[in-house]
Amino acid sequence: MKKNGILNRELSYLIASMGHGDILSIVDSGFPISEDVFCVDLSLIAGKPKIVEIIIPLLEELEIEKVLIAEEIKMISPKYHQKLLSIFPKNVQIEYIPHEKFKDRVRESKGVVRTGEQTSYSSVILVGGVTYHGEKEEGL
């Protein structure tokens, strides 16, 4: 039995399979998900779990270099937008794109995590990073 970290088997698999530049989408309960994209459905009831509740433990296990967010969030859900921004490390690039383009990018995901979130334009795309940089000397 796994002792700590993310316990969900499918989500753990998805995290372990992420490479540099791969896309992992965390979406609200009503977001359209293509049948040909691997989906981990964590939705339980309306509003639970929230996207932020999923992202926080994900950040403990997954290196990300960029986050994509629908630009509409700034006007439609400004309080949620500020909360979302507060959970990402300062070195992570935040990029805003129109919601229609956002939906297209989700279709390129290695996987999608559906939550119970019901805040408008709350979905995010995480772009995988790397945990090492530059030349590494081994065995020399």
Swiss-Prot record:
Record key words, sorted: Carbohydrate metabolism, Cytoplasm, Isomerase
Primary location group: cytoplasm
UniProt-listed Enzyme Commission number(s): 5.4.99.62
Binding residues for substrate: D28, H99, Y121, S122, S123
GO MF: D-ribose pyranase activity; intramolecular lyase activity; monosaccharide binding
Cysteines engaged in disulfide bonds, as pairs: none
Location of this chain's protein in the cell: Cytoplasm
Active site positions: H20 (proton donor)
Keyword Transmembrane in annotation: no
Major enzyme class: isomerase
Protein's pathway: Carbohydrate metabolism; D-ribose degradation; D-ribose 5-phosphate from beta-D-ribopyranose: step 1/2
Listed name of the protein: D-ribose pyranase
